[in-house]
């Protein structure tokens, strides 16, 4: 397990990244059926690339060729499935507050990103 947090400010703003390696796919397979495919979302790929630069980490989330994701807008209390909804949250919202969980099929790895500004 890899975990890094950078929180601060009056409202506990910031970002958290957790990575879980060698996850038993059989334990989460029932969840993945309702998640979106990662290769259909350039927005999710962009978020994952920018997480490492936010922290200034040597650790870089690799490009995920095959997997699934679940993106939840914590401010609106709803799951975001379309690129239009994701772009509205990231580009046009005053309160960016989301949880992102990504499953990498090839590496059996889960990436969790919590972001609040």
For each of these PLM feature ranges, what is it?
Residues 34-109, 114-116:
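Functional cores of ribonucleases/endoribonucleases
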Residues 22-24, 114-117:
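Secondary-structure transition/turn motif
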Residues 8-9, 14, 56, 67:
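Residue-identity detector for glycine
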Residues 9-38, 44:
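Terminal, regulation- and interaction-focused segments at domain boundaries
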Residues 1-2:
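Short, small-residue-biased leader/transition segments that mark boundaries at the very start
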